[in-house]
């Protein structure tokens, strides 16, 4: 079985048991307590804790992508040096929210590993909690009692946290053989590799209170997890996950890039790279970006660790981005968004590689120099300098030292890091904007925050208070043809914030204003000069024409929010937005996709409000007063004591610092272009208005005319319907041709024998036709419908074989059962992966019967 087959087999198996198959949730969870989704149950956490109601149906199955590379669950240091640690992995799981419990969960698990995966029963062992007599007794109906081991809380009790849902768990182990693993730790419960855990079944049956007391849950739940990487290696007869088809194609690519063959014993660097490129590719494809903190910093650490291992292999130029194609080839079939994001992911990786490779040589030189003075502990000061100056994450330095049997003074490193953070915090207390690099503190102390006048004025005379280079360092002047940042005493340019893009425009006769952003309370404009600028210059500023279109889209976003609450429900809450001159994007909390009818109602309501018109009203008031007045505020947003409230008649009222139209009739028209999901419980609407909507309508008309021309019809809809009918007819002919080919037969003792799998048609009709055409006939047909249901039927005419026994024999190979009369019988099956085996065995069964 290849990895894709295992993934599909698992999901299909549990779908056949009534589970709803759900897609993998994002790697960045909607959970402030976690850096990344690190287990299959994370997307369902709020269901297990009772924060949200049980879904329908209350049983689910998934193949969840996971990252463990930060926080409590951090496997980064071990990756590459063990057979099974990974930063990125896929977790197969089935979940029951108060529906079935231990009996069914254990039965499903045993059936899947023994009948679908076909793992030898004499290689399997299980563990249960020492107090879980119920699980022990259930398991004893499937496996010999001497193969069931009891362990305590450390091994067989699971809980989310200090309080909340928890319960005993049961693990399934695979014996890799004493002939391969015979260290003192290779026993059940030991740390050796002989007995390998492949599946963990968690029985959430208790609620733990703050005092540690366990109380039975009224509706116990099931949470299971099986690592795809582990089970793939086992099925392929490999003792290391990295030797399986999930990783070897990547390792082979690394070997090509470095020009050195891979040898397992000395191949840690190959394994690190093959693991890390999966994490980096998936995180970037899902929208995480390289950063100096948080998830973005973990992403950077993973990539830089891989780059350093490439350096060890002699690769001293960007190479990780070249591996993205292979990741997409291996995994893009199931995770199709990888293919869509491939080009952007490669570009981001290459840029990050170039940045680090520019400093890695100097950093390694410092490392080697300091190493000469190190006996056992590498100094924290040197480690901090490697981090602060050369971009070496601490765990990368620790990784290099571990290879030499040394350690780093982490305590001193942490002290220096804390001191740096304290200095930054003191300098920027109350700021909360962007990064702390650059000469912002000096500007704040000298000038304070500059004034934004762009609500009232789109043109103004201003004075240049400061000029900064691209690194935000103070400079006296900016030559013609250069880019830099300008601080004006007063500015009409809106700085990017609240989802609205920053203004562009011009310094009349001097420069183009490309963008405007806010840094620690300072409104700074990025400019490209056509004439020299210097500090103290008196200049004329003019906001670009994009501002008007941006304002229309921002006001339309407020109307969209109000319409969603009116049509879909008041539970709708903004989860993010992006407003530009030619489009808007609005993310909102909602558990499912909007229907076509809901989308139309929302769009119609917004346009109705636009036609009717309503004046904009802005007020500055106390935060609590604003909330009491009914103004909508973002739940996670931090507001000042005084806030700006924007309202449009009785239609909309929100806390907002952005720019808007004076009357909503200025928006013109509004059109929703897309509704999609962002993550569990978050939906996204993309839309256009004003000129962008007009341009879209024109493009639709042009496409319609092109379609008419292509179809040679003035009524393209009717032409398409006609084409669909013709295509259906051709498909039917193709299916019939396939069936005709499939029904080729053998001659056995003057009996026409046919055993086949067919794509379409009525099985009974085909069998009757076959029997009518031949004096002596024996036919068995297998068919799988669109939902994966397997149907079998057998027919016999004037031949020494019984249809009932024959079809039952075939069905049992497919994990099902059936029977019937001697001349005609039917059955059902479950395991589509065994169809070829069923056909071969059924032919042999019939041969033996007919040749007697």
UniProtKB/Swiss-Prot annotation:
One of its GO terms (cellular component) is cytosol. One of its GO terms (biological process) is negative regulation of DNA-templated transcription. It is found in: Cytoplasm. Catalyzes the attachment of alanine to tRNA(Ala) in a two-step reaction: alanine is first activated by ATP to form Ala-AMP and then transferred to the acceptor end of tRNA(Ala). Also edits incorrectly charged Ser-tRNA(Ala) and Gly-tRNA(Ala) via its editing domain. Pfam families: DHHA1 (PF02272), tRNA-synt_2c (PF01411), tRNA_SAD (PF07973). CDD domains: AlaRS_core (cd00673). The gene is alaS. InterPro entries: aa-tRNA-synth_II/BPL/LPL, Ala-tRNA-lgiase_IIc, Ala-tRNA-ligase_IIc_anticod-bd, Ala-tRNA-synth_IIc_core, Ala-tRNA-synth_IIc_N, Ala-tRNA_ligase, Ala_tRNA_ligase_euk/bac, DHHA1_dom. Keywords: Aminoacyl-tRNA synthetase, ATP-binding, Cytoplasm, Ligase, Metal-binding, Nucleotide-binding, Protein biosynthesis, RNA-binding, tRNA-binding, Zinc. Consists of three domains; the N-terminal catalytic domain, the editing domain and the C-terminal C-Ala domain. The editing domain removes incorrectly charged amino acids, while the C-Ala domain, along with tRNA(Ala), serves as a bridge to cooperatively bring together the editing and aminoacylation centers thus stimulating deacylation of misacylated tRNAs. It comes from Campylobacter concisus (strain 13826). Zn(2+) binds at residues 554, 558, 656, 660. It catalyses: tRNA(Ala) + L-alanine + ATP = L-alanyl-tRNA(Ala) + AMP + diphosphate. One of its GO terms (molecular function) is tRNA binding. Its EC number is 6.1.1.7. This is Alanine--tRNA ligase. It comes from the Bacteria. Belongs to the class-II aminoacyl-tRNA synthetase family. Its cofactor is Zn(2+). Binds 1 zinc ion per subunit. Gene3D superfamilies: 2.40.30.130, 3.10.310.40, 3.30.54.20, Bira Bifunctional Protein, Domain 2, Threonyl-trna Synthetase, Chain A, domain 2.
